[in-house]
Amino acid sequence: MSSEEGKLFVGGLNFNTDEQALEDHFSSFGPISEVVVVKDRETQRSRGFGFITFTNPEHASDAMRAMNGESLDGRQIRVDHAGKSARGSRGGAFGGRGRSYSRGGGDQGYGSGRYDSRPGGYGYGYGRSRDYSGSQGGYDRYSGGNYRDNYDN
């Protein structure tokens, strides 16, 4: 887990910022073991965020405090520990690796929990989820079941 402790999420990147530029801006805080700018699989264009792993977790904390909210290549960046941001602010539409598609109904404990407990569950990327049957009368057994039949076989 030591490598995870030194791993930072960097969001709000300029689409032209690459690994080298990111490393150049953060290397003054200490030795870096890995720099990744996440790219779209098909277009290879930056998705506007990345990760930096410091060999020493204390260096990562120093970098996070100093660089969060700073400007990099003309964009204000957000820097946080990697584990926090992946679950917290970005967990909504993805629901923690798609587990929101289970039929449990409660969903407490999946993802961050911030989006799952909203009444009706609409507006946060869960439109296709089957967890909300009956809450809004849309895609459930009361409308004939034709939406659910394809998924239940």
Curated annotation (Swiss-Prot):
Gene behind this protein: Rbm3
Protein's name according to its UniProt entry: RNA-binding protein 3
Modified residues annotated as Phosphotyrosine in this record: Y151
Keyword Transmembrane helix: no
Keywords in alphabetical order: Cell projection, Cytoplasm, Methylation, Nucleus, Phosphoprotein, RNA-binding, Stress response
Modified residues (Phosphoserine): S133, S143
Complexes and interactors: Interacts with RPL4. Associates with the 60S ribosomal subunits in an RNA-independent manner.
Disordered: annotated span: 81-153
Post-translational modification: Arg-103 is dimethylated, probably to asymmetric dimethylarginine. Phosphorylated.
InterPro entries for this protein: Nucleotide-bd_a/b_plait_sf (IPR012677), RBD_domain_sf (IPR035979), RBM (IPR050441), RBM3/CIRBP_RRM (IPR034278), RRM_dom (IPR000504)
Modified residues (Asymmetric dimethylarginine): R103
Pfam families (UniProt xref): RRM_1
GO BP, sorted A to Z: miRNA processing; positive regulation of translation; regulation of translation; response to cold; translation
Chief place of localization: nucleus
Highest taxon of source: Eukaryota
Record field: compositional bias (Gly residues): 89-112
GO cellular-component term (any): dendrite
Free-text function comment from the UniProt entry: Cold-inducible mRNA binding protein that enhances global protein synthesis at both physiological and mild hypothermic temperatures. Reduces the relative abundance of microRNAs, when overexpressed. Enhances phosphorylation of translation initiation factors and active polysome formation.
Subcellular location: Nucleus; Cytoplasm; Cell projection, Dendrite
Omega-N-methylarginine: residues carrying this PTM: R47, R103, R118, R128
